[in-house]
Amino acid sequence: MPANYQQLAVVRRLVHDLNIPLKVVGVSTARERDGLAMSSRNRRLSLKQRALAPCLYRTLLAARQSIAYGERTAAAIKEGAAQVLQSVPEIKLEYFELVDPDTIRPVDVVNAPVRAALAAWIGKTRLIDNLYCEPRRCPVSKER
């Protein structure tokens, strides 16, 4: 959620519902070289915690890859992605969801683009991140 996609979705909905003549434009999440979403909260991390933090992005990438390779069941996608975090007990996952980009409601089946979104605690610092994920559309091969 561009560092906070949820806020972007709420503002877009507000502008739409109130018929405000504005175009709300989201931008990509700014990331450090190791994939960690840039945030003022990152300053609160110790050096050891900071070294663990890119695992959050790798978790989101695992979900994206699972979706790209054809997995459509949200539970299976989330379970696979959560395995990335299991190797890092210092990270306490608060939530990991696949949500509809417009409504921010969790989905059970991925048949359209979604946002993989998570929040986790590393020590006393809460970090959030999200990533756009799109199901791959593979052409049907013609058998002869």
Where are these regions (language model features)?
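Phosphate/ribose-recognition catalytic cores of enzymes acting on nucleotide-derived substrates
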Residues: 80-144
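Nucleotidyltransferase catalytic core that binds NTPs
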Residues: 1-90, 99, 103, 131
